[in-house]
Amino acid sequence: ITRQIDLIEEIGRLHGFNKFLTRLPKIKTIGIEDSSYQTRKKITACLLNAGFNELIHYSLVNETTFINNDIKLFNPLLNDCSSLRSSLLPNLIKTVTENLKQGNFYVEGFEYGHIFSGNILNAFEEKEYIGGIFGGIKTKLNWSETLQSLSWFEAKGKIEHLFKQLNLIVYWKVHFNKTYNQILHPYRTAELSLVDGINLGIFGQIHPILARKLNLSPELYLFEFNLDLVKDQIKSNKLSTYKEYSLYPKIVKDLSFIVEQTISFEEIQKILRFNGTKFLTEINLLDEY
C-alpha cells in the first residue's frame, strides 16, 4: 500500500464493494471566496457601474499587434494564433475597430487576462492583468452645449475614481516605457505606481498615428495594470472605519505657487500631504496659468 487509493481499495474489498450505495451523500457546504475572486468582483462592479462592458479575447495573437515583444510560438496551428500576447491593449483596440465597422460606436470595455513576458533568466513569466478602453464618443452635458470628446484629464479622473473606490493610493508619473510606443501617445501617457514605488501599470491616450491608421477617434483612452498587485494592496489596506460627522463647516483655501515647469503637481501634492495636519482631507488642482 503506497497510495491513498490503495488504502481505499483495501477498505472496499474488506467491507464489500456490493455494500456501497450507488448515490452520493447529501452534503451541504458553503463555498469560500478567495481574495483574488473578491478583488475581481469588486473591480467588475465598479467598471460596470461606470458603463463598461466585460470583454474576452484569446491569449494567442498574430504578429501584427503593435507590440514587438510578443512571444512567438515554434509551431503555431494558425497564423492568427502564432504568439503569446504581452499586453491586453492590442485586442481591445481591435475589438473597438471591428465594432465601429459594424456601426456600433459605443464600445467601452475591460478585460481580465494573462500576459506573457521573458525575464533576465531567459524564462517566461505569466501574470494576470486587467486592461480597458474607453472614450472616443462625443457627448454633451446639457442641451446648450455642443458635442465634446472626453479630455485626457476627464479620462484620468475616471481611473482615479476607480482607485478611490478600491481604496488605493496610486501615483502618476511621466511615461518612459518603450513597450507601448506604437500604441500610446508619447506625451499623454502616464505610468502608475503604488506607494512603495512598485510599477502598477499604465494609462494613456491612443497614439494619433495609430488612430488615423485604424480610422479611430484620437480621444480614445486605454489602461492596463497588474491585478495581483491590486489584490495584494487591497489585502494589506486597513479596514474602512466610520466616525462621527463633523459639526463644523469645512474650510477651503486657495493656494498659488510659482514653480519650475519641471515640477509636477504630484510632487507639490506629496509635500502638502506630508506637512499637512490631520484635518487636511483633500487637495485639488484648480488652474494652471
Task: Describe each PLM feature range.
Residues 1, 22-35, 70-77, 126-146, ...:
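Short, hydrophobic beta-strand segments
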Residues 1-6, 32-40, 66-70, 121-126, ...:
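Short glycine/threonine-rich loop-to-helix capping motif typified by GTGT followed
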Residues 1-110:
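Extended, well-folded interaction surfaces typified by the phenylalanyl-tRNA synthetase beta subunit core
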Residues 6-12, 75, 114, 123-136, ...:
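Short beta-strand elements
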Residues 8, 47, 92, 132, ...:
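A residue-level signal for conserved active-site and pocket-lining positions in enzyme catalytic cores
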Residues 54-55, 86-134, 208, 219-238, ...:
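Conserved alpha/beta core surface patches that mediate binding of polyanionic ligands
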Residues 139-289:
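A carboxyl-terminal module marker
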Residues 2-3, 55-58, 64, 81-83, ...:
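Short helix/loop capping segments that flank catalytic or ligand/cofactor-binding pockets
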